[in-house]
Amino acid sequence: MAKSGIAAGVNKGRKTTAKEVAPKISYRKGASSQRTVFVRSIVKEVAGLAPYERRLIELIRNAGEKRAKKLAKKRLGTHKRALRKVEEMTQVIAESRRH
């Protein structure tokens, strides 16, 4: 609450200007920095896809999404990560079709 400058009441106390506090560093947890994103993109460009990613692409093209999701979950551990990876691989397929 803002101070009123009056000695009594709910907002009692001397009027002061609020100090501008920088946000905590911990609030950025999980967010990728520009540098990290850049380095990862370079590594992916140079190294290519992992063997399981190539297999995922093959499964998406032939057997459909369900098999691909099952394999991705087995390799990555969680359902959420698997869904994200399968979506990423479908984007890779779409990119390869465009070029």
Swiss-Prot record:
GO cellular component: cytosolic large ribosomal subunit
Alphabetically ordered keywords of this record: Cytoplasm, Ribonucleoprotein, Ribosomal protein
Cell location: Cytoplasm
GO terms for MF: structural constituent of ribosome
InterPro entries according to UniProt: Ribosomal_eL36, Ribosomal_eL36_sf
Pfam families in the record: Ribosomal_L36e
BP term (GO), one: cytoplasmic translation
Record-stated family: Belongs to the eukaryotic ribosomal protein eL36 family.
Function: Component of the ribosome, a large ribonucleoprotein complex responsible for the synthesis of proteins in the cell. The small ribosomal subunit (SSU) binds messenger RNAs (mRNAs) and translates the encoded message by selecting cognate aminoacyl-transfer RNA (tRNA) molecules. The large subunit (LSU) contains the ribosomal catalytic site termed the peptidyl transferase center (PTC), which catalyzes the formation of peptide bonds, thereby polymerizing the amino acids delivered by tRNAs into a polypeptide chain.
Assembly notes: Component of the large ribosomal subunit. Mature ribosomes consist of a small (40S) and a large (60S) subunit. The 40S subunit contains about 32 different proteins and 1 molecule of RNA (18S). The 60S subunit contains 45 different proteins and 3 molecules of RNA (25S, 5.8S and 5S).
Full protein name: Large ribosomal subunit protein eL36
Organism: Candida albicans (strain SC5314 / ATCC MYA-2876)
